[in-house]
């Protein structure tokens, strides 16, 4: 599509509580939110990281051994990309007529991956990527994405849609490669992250993670949607975090929408509020921002600094 005209696109960022470790209820809630966004005129919609079946914060405060039963349940309630459950979600996206980036814990054979599926308004999965490096203790439970997951932007009827998961936003080269793919609207899929406190380092706070994503809007001259989860007080015990002072419930949400100069486009919701944030955006505003800052164009020095990217995905099995 042409980005030069006055066409307005409505974007939608989810902030909601998952149906913890319950695949079927998680699919049902996902469908409800998609239909709601469609009825409210959304064109592009983003969901949090591992929205289905929710982010397991217990992996940060309990040992792998202590989490065996919990994570077994988590595995069984993770979503397969090629499944009846995904087909139901795809049908809802088609009914709503939107472009959706769905974050979920992907179950593939015997492994889990932190994944995003890009679903167009026809209900087709036009791209699928996995977090290339799960963060810290996450590596005990989720596998890594390969070179095909470096592609993070796809063309759509509503502009070029990109997406990254959580601390992938700290991967400077990965961000840069997304800018080089000419992203217009970026879906920043985050889990629930709580406010700054003495128990955790500041870089694992909603304040810092929000700032990091805001910088991506400015740096990439793109519209950015922070999509995050929340946790209610009654679900703390269910998630094995009821005795952890770092967890403030209800809370964990920090969803937001930013413009291509890094400006906030909506009022930030309360950290414990379930809401879909909406903003009407004009993609042509990107070019105004690019006049000043185009880090993959006029404000770059490829003769001095450049990025090397592989596009050959590694495989466990090779045929002679």
From Swiss-Prot:
Ranges annotated as spanning the membrane: none
GO molecular function (one): nitrilase activity
Residue numbers annotated as active site: 49 (proton acceptor), 131, 166 (nucleophile)
Catalysed reaction equations from the record: a nitrile + 2 H2O = a carboxylate + NH4(+)
CDD domains in UniProt: nitrilases_CHs
Protein name: Aromatic nitrilase
InterPro entries (alphabetical): C-N_Hydrolase, C-N_Hydrolase_sf, Nitrilase/CN_hydratase_CS, Nitrilases_CHs
Keywords associated with the record: Hydrolase
Family, as annotated: Belongs to the carbon-nitrogen hydrolase superfamily. Nitrilase family.
Enzyme class: hydrolase
Record flagged with keyword Acetylation: no
């Amino acid at each position: 599509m042409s980005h030069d005209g006055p066409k307005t696109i409505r974007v939608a960022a989810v902030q909601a509580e998952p149906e913890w470790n319950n695949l079927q209820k998680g699919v049902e809630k996902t469908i409800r939110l998609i239909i709601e966004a469609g009825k409210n005129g959304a064109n592009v919609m983003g969901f949090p990281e591992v929205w289905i079946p929710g982010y397991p914060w217990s992996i940060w405060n309990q040992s792998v051994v202590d989490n065996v039963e919990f994570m077994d349940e988590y595995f069984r309630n993770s979503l397969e990309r090629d499944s009846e459950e995904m087909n139901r979600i795809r049908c809802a996206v088609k009914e709503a007529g939107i472009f959706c980036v769905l974050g979920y814990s992907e179950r593939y054979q015997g492994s889990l991956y932190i994944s995003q599926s890009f679903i167009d308004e026809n209900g087709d999965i036009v791209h699928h990527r996995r977090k290339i490096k799960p963060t810290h203790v996450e590596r005990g439970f989720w596998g890594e994405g390969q070179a095909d997951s470096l592609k993070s932007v796809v063309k759509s009827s509503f502009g070029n849609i990109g997406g990254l998961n959580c601390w992938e936003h700290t991967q400077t080269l990965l961000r840069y490669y997304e800018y080089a793919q000419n992203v217009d609207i970026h879906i920043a899929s985050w889990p629930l992250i709580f406010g700054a406190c003495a128990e955790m380092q500041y870089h694992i706070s909603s304040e810092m993670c929000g700032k990091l994503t805001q910088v991506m809007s400015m740096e990439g001259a793109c519209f950015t949607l922070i999509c995050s989860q929340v946790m209610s007080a009654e679900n703390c015990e269910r998630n094995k975090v009821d005795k952890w002072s770092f967890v403030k419930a209800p809370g964990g949400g920090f969803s937001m929408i930013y413009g291509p100069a890094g400006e906030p486009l909506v009022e930030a919701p309360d950290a414990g509020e379930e809401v879909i944030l909406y903003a009407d955006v004009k993609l042509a505003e990107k070019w105004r921002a690019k006049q000043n800052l185009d880090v993959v164009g006029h404000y770059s020095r490829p003769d001095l600094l450049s990025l090397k990217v592989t596009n050959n995905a590694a495989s466990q099995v090779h045929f002679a």
